[in-house]
Amino acid sequence: MSRSFGDKAAHSVGVIDEPEIIEIDIEKFEGKIVCVVVASDGVWEFVGNEYIKNIVMKYLREKNAKGCCEEICKKSREFWERSGCAIDDITCVVGYFEYEDSNKNNVIINEISDNGYFNM
């Protein structure tokens, strides 16, 4: 696991302060909608990639990033509550990107956390 700021106590169990970076050439997605999900460990603790993919696909047609974020956070919280553990931070950012051509691209980004939401 990586995070943008180091955590000395967690370093002993493998947490690093070097971010994981992935570069993708969006030109190969011309005419398609791409979705990016960035979430805190409070989301990924119980919710896997396949589960997130199913939620993303549900909101894809309308490019409803806010609805997608809300459902991801809601489901994550439900998993935490069923686990009986204290609830970790739950934060999620979803971006739907529709690549049309090299001169134009549409971006819809919404962020929602367990405390409320922020739209960009």
Regions found by a protein language model. Name each.
Residues 1-120:
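PP2C/PPM-type serine/threonine phosphatase catalytic core
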